[in-house]
Amino acid sequence: MARYIFITGGVVSSLGKGIAAATLAALLQARGYRVRLRKLDPYLNVDPGTMSPYQHGEVFVTDDGAETDLDLGHYERFTGHSANSQDNITTGRIYRNIIERERRGDYLGATVQVIPHVTDEIKRFITTGNEEFDFILCEIGGTVGDIEAMPFLEAIRQLHNELPRQSVIYVHLTLMPYISSVGELKTKPTQHSVKELQSIGISPDILLVRADRPIPETERCKLSLFCNVRPSAVIQALNMPTIYDVPMAYHKEGLDSEVLCAFGIDPTPKPKMDRWEDITYRIHHLEGEVTIAVVGKYTGLKDAYKSLIEAIAHGGLANKVKVNIEWIEAELFEKEDPASYLQKVHGILVPGAFGARGAEGKIQAIQFARERKVPFLGICFGMQLACIEVARNIAKIENASSSEFCETKNPIVGLMTEWLKEDVLEKRAKCGNLGGTMRLGAFAAELKEGSHIAKIYGMTRILERHRHRYEVNVDYKDKLEQCGLIFSGMSPDGVLPEAIEYADHPWFIGVQYHPELKSRPFDPHPLFSSFIEATVEQSRLV
């Protein structure tokens, strides 16, 4: 029988509920339990696929093609288990499901209301498909007190009474701010947050309290008294140097032990923390450092590149180096010479994006990497622009561009109108909806025997996650290959380019997919490991 852990947040947003949920799942996993993580988002969008990166941050894509919250990336990286479309739901998706049922007449003429229909739909999502797991951890997005979150909180309140005894606990993540003028950590914000939670019928079993310094025992006892939790269930969650330090820190604070105690599990399995001890040791015993430039479009919000940042760090771990990232807004290179910004970096990475803004600046960065023999990795949009760069500067194709930017006689990159998914032809009209209409999820690619990328992978058939609406136009393949560009990866049907490289460049690779989505701290993606290895070599030349 599955047990349920609901993680809520209070006081302020962005406290790290996703990291807390992923950490707790990893700790339970270390004790031999089977865990599943789910995220419930209160916004009305059906999914984050059409949301601005500045509003939402990264859109994390699962193998089955779901566009989900970035916290699912943390879930995968901490547990090693792949998420799917049933691990993230939004208010928009819930309402869409309910309205579809109402139109079909499934409610038999009943007045459709938030209670019971919306709450029942939420409960159905939470409790479905959990037969193979010991613990289901559900993170409730937003902050307690937000009007959007009320149906979710009501649903998890109801589940406490509907499921067997000792099947549900609540973990509340909160903040204990330090007031420098008086030199004290303050408990009052947490007290009020818990009071708000209790007013809707939920009493937290465990308080996970964020703080930037150790919490005195007197303040813990105060929280215990006023928030109605055991003193041992007030767990301090101190700021850590990296997110991969968090599991060991929470374990030492007794979070996993307290959770098992709340469920009445005794005796508890002994945890095997070897791999977390190893990863924290390696993080703090690096032997050098390199610097790479990420030339992007959304550099003002690092959450837009969350998986990319982590994958770069994983590549650094694999090479025992710290990787410093120089964030460069691509539009800068449309006004200034990129050389002054890029001549001292050891690698250049152009990540995925949409739209024309910043594209010309990225092309300038790609040209610099190609001509100066600087290690280069282009992801999705980055690969497309690398093809436009060679078309313009070597093949001399007039007006070479992308149909995403403008009408052009030479669309090196064009809109995909059809592609194969699991042997089924999917089609898209140019004037169709944007949401959920891209090439999404895991697709196979065939790598050219003997190519650089095939050697990196150690195989010629790979399965990687995609999220794109445009694709390099295969009609220009021969002309670009005559200029030295190698199409080293193609879709199995030979229609869609998946990877490019140069034979005469020490490390220049572009891929249409998103390798960062499958990188793990314990299993770094081979492309990032190899890319950072190349930057280490480059650092010896600069």
From Swiss-Prot:
GO terms for cellular component: cytosol. Transmembrane segments: none annotated. ATP binds at residues 14-19, 71. Residues 291-541 form the Glutamine amidotransferase type-1 domain. L-glutamine binds at residues 54, 353, 381-384, 404, 469. Coiled coil: none annotated. Pathway: Pyrimidine metabolism; CTP biosynthesis via de novo pathway; CTP from UDP: step 2/2. GO terms for molecular function: ATP binding; CTP synthase activity; glutaminase activity; identical protein binding; metal ion binding. Mg(2+) binds at residues 71, 139. It catalyses: UTP + L-glutamine + ATP + H2O = CTP + L-glutamate + ADP + phosphate + 2 H(+); L-glutamine + H2O = L-glutamate + NH4(+); UTP + NH4(+) + ATP = CTP + ADP + phosphate + 2 H(+). Residues 1-265 are annotated as: Amidoligase domain. Allosterically activated by GTP, when glutamine is the substrate; GTP has no effect on the reaction when ammonia is the substrate. The allosteric effector GTP functions by stabilizing the protein conformation that binds the tetrahedral intermediate(s) formed during glutamine hydrolysis. Inhibited by the product CTP, via allosteric rather than competitive inhibition. The keyword Magnesium applies. Gene3D superfamilies: 3.40.50.880, P-loop containing nucleotide triphosphate hydrolases. One of its GO terms (biological process) is 'de novo' CTP biosynthetic process. UTP binds at residues 13, 186-191, 222. Its EC number is 6.3.4.2. Belongs to the CTP synthase family. CTPSs have evolved a hybrid strategy for distinguishing between UTP and CTP. The overlapping regions of the product feedback inhibitory and substrate sites recognize a common feature in both compounds, the triphosphate moiety. To differentiate isosteric substrate and product pyrimidine rings, an additional pocket far from the expected kinase/ligase catalytic site, specifically recognizes the cytosine and ribose portions of the product inhibitor. PANTHER family: CTP SYNTHASE, CTP SYNTHASE-RELATED. Catalyzes the ATP-dependent amination of UTP to CTP with either L-glutamine or ammonia as the source of nitrogen. Regulates intracellular CTP levels through interactions with the four ribonucleotide triphosphates. NCBIfam families: PRK05380.1, PyrG. This is CTP synthase. It comes from Bartonella quintana (strain Toulouse). The gene is pyrG.
